[in-house]
């Protein structure tokens, strides 16, 4: 039990939590501003509400699936966690979404929004970002 607690603390300690403007710059540099018509502010809002910009965020859902990483990408549809029956549409292991190298997560998020639901696939975006004034998400970032 003590070993498990230590391992969990190490995993949390190694999490990368981005500062809002730093994250916005990274997203812009990865071509997310305007990708599929989605503004940078929408991406920043989405990830604020999904993970608070935390690369190691996970959330277990009532259907047995898990959401992974800074975008909270779901194991039922987008990645393989070897526990959930999956479509694995991003063709990745879910653990790849929990690393500090967010390029895989960004590529998968781009794949998600190519589906008919677009950015609406994320409940947090629908509840907190859709139709809102999102200017505060880029305020002070110089973007």
UniProtKB/Swiss-Prot annotation:
Location relative to the cell: Secreted
Lineage of source species: Eukaryota, Metazoa, Chordata, Craniata, Vertebrata
Principal EC category: hydrolase
Keywords: Antimicrobial, Bacteriolytic enzyme, Disulfide bond, Glycoprotein, Glycosidase, Hydrolase, Secreted, Signal
UniProt EC number: 3.2.1.17
Stored InterPro entries: Glyco_hydro_22, Glyco_hydro_22_lys, Lysozyme-like_dom_sf
Other known facts: Lysozyme C is capable of both hydrolysis and transglycosylation; it also shows a slight esterase activity. It acts rapidly on both peptide-substituted and unsubstituted peptidoglycan, and slowly on chitin oligosaccharides.
Residue ranges of domain C-type lysozyme in the record: 16-143
Function recorded in the entry: Lysozymes have primarily a bacteriolytic function; those in tissues and body fluids are associated with the monocyte-macrophage system and enhance the activity of immunoagents.
SMART domains: LYZ1 (SM00263)
SUPFAM superfamilies: Lysozyme-like
Active site: 50, 67
Gene3D superfamilies to which the protein is assigned, alphabetical: 1.10.530.10
Signal peptide: 1-15
Cellular component, GO, one term: extracellular region
Matches recorded under Pfam families: Lys (PF00062)
UniProt protein name: Lysozyme C
One example GO MF annotation: lysozyme activity
Predominant place of localization: secreted
Disulfide bonds: 21-141, 45-129, 79-94, 90-108
Catalysis performed (reactions): Hydrolysis of (1->4)-beta-linkages between N-acetylmuramic acid and N-acetyl-D-glucosamine residues in a peptidoglycan and between N-acetyl-D-glucosamine residues in chitodextrins
Similarity annotation: Belongs to the glycosyl hydrolase 22 family.
Domain of life: Eukaryota
Glycosylation sites: 80
Subunit structure: Monomer.
Entry's Gene Ontology BP terms: defense response to bacterium; killing of cells of another organism
